[in-house]
From Swiss-Prot:
A GO biological process held by the record: adenine salvage
Pfam families, per database record: Pribosyltran (PF00156)
Keyword list, A-Z: Cytoplasm, Glycosyltransferase, Purine salvage, Transferase
GO cellular component: cytosol
Enzyme class: transferase
UniProt-listed SUPFAM superfamilies: PRTase-like
InterPro entries in the record: Ade_phspho_trans, Adenine_PRTase, PRibTrfase_dom, PRTase-like
Catalytic activity: AMP + diphosphate = 5-phospho-alpha-D-ribose 1-diphosphate + adenine
Protein name: Adenine phosphoribosyltransferase
Originating species: Burkholderia cenocepacia (strain HI2424)
Cellular compartments annotated: Cytoplasm
Protein family per UniProt: Belongs to the purine/pyrimidine phosphoribosyltransferase family.
Lineage: Bacteria, Pseudomonadati, Pseudomonadota, Betaproteobacteria, Burkholderiales
Record GO terms (molecular function): adenine phosphoribosyltransferase activity
Length: 188
């Protein structure tokens, strides 16, 4: 049973938040990078994090968990495994070997493209889409659009961290995507 192990924190969300390292001025001055590697290095924190997602989605009747390249690939397959559903990778352009569908999205300076195999899911499949964090929301929006173009029902967008000051979670919600994040950090 989730969180029943000895030494489990009384507030799992606060514990997860405390396990995320902030690296100032990386990758550029003024950015407060939220580093999940410290969370992942702790077996206790990783178990609690996975349990939080599993508890949320255990009764959602999902067919797949989709993960966004690259840090979404860390947690999404673990959650898919725990839920006994498939994992769908949504990759940066040119990384998938079979026939793909692609979706471009805007970045602060330029644009990027993600792809999905055209047979990754079928119409009516219920899917959540996961990443490590939501900043501007562009990558998750592109992933959602790809899944919907394949006919999937995108149940929710999920991430470990929300950076609400960057507006991504609001953008996604305004576009009709329900969003769940474990914790949030203010600022950039």
């Amino acid at each position: 049973m989730p969180h029943s192990s000895p030494g489990a924190p009384l507030d799992p969300v606060a514990f997860i938040h405390s396990q995320i390292r902030t690296v100032p001025d990386w990758p550029q001055p003024g950015v407060q990078f939220r580093d999940i590697t410290t969370l992942l290095q702790s077996p206790k924190a990783l178990r609690i994090l996975v349990d939080l997602f599993v508890e949320r989605y255990v009764d959602a009747k999902l067919d797949y968990v989709a993960g966004l390249d690259a840090r979404g690939f860390i947690i999404a397959p673990i959650v898919a495994y725990e839920l006994s559903v498939g994992f769908v990778p949504i990759r940066k352009v040119g990384k998938l070997p079979y026939k793909t569908r692609s979706e471009s999205y805007d970045l602060e300076y330029g644009s990027a493209t993600v792809e999905i195999h055209e047979d990754a899911c079928k119409p009516g499949d219920r899917v959540i889409i996961m990443d490590d964090l939501i900043a501007t929301g562009g990558t998750m929006m592109a992933g959602r659009n790809l899944l919907q173009r394949l006919g999937a029902e995108v149940v929710e967008g999920a991430a470990i961290i929300d950076l609400p000051d960057l507006g991504g979670s609001t953008l996604l919600r305004n576009a009709g995507l329900t969003v769940y994040t474990v914790t949030e950090f203010s600022g950039h």
